[in-house]
Amino acid sequence: MSVLLVTDERFLDHVAGRSHPERPARLTAVLDGIAAAGLDDALVRRAPSPVADVDLFRVHPAGHVESLVDLDSAGGGRLDPDTVMGPGSWLAARLAAGAGLVAIDGLRNGDADVAFCAVRPPGHHATPTRTMGFCLLNNVAVAA
């Protein structure tokens, strides 16, 4: 069985704070575990592309996206009690949201049997108009 792995080193640029539980080491641990398990021969690696606005706006209204762009331009900040943007967070979030689309395309093209997106920040808690639970965008909804 072949596995399409969609990931990118730029996900490590999302830093929510030194003591924040959603930290770069989480992704590093996943990738180290894959390597330690000797799974490299089963992997088809792909890099994500930042999600296109047309795909992003199917889930998130322009005003919500603009507020994230503005905060990114200001260098980041706290969005809610759990969710923080740092200087590399907005690009990482757009890449994470685009990763699911790359995975779907790869599966449709027959590049692999299954896909795994090793991304950060995560993207399963955000609502269309709110960040939540470490998530800036809802990657799952974008991919759907």
Task: List where the protein language model places each region.
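HDAC/HDAC-like amidohydrolase catalytic core signature
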Residues: 1-144
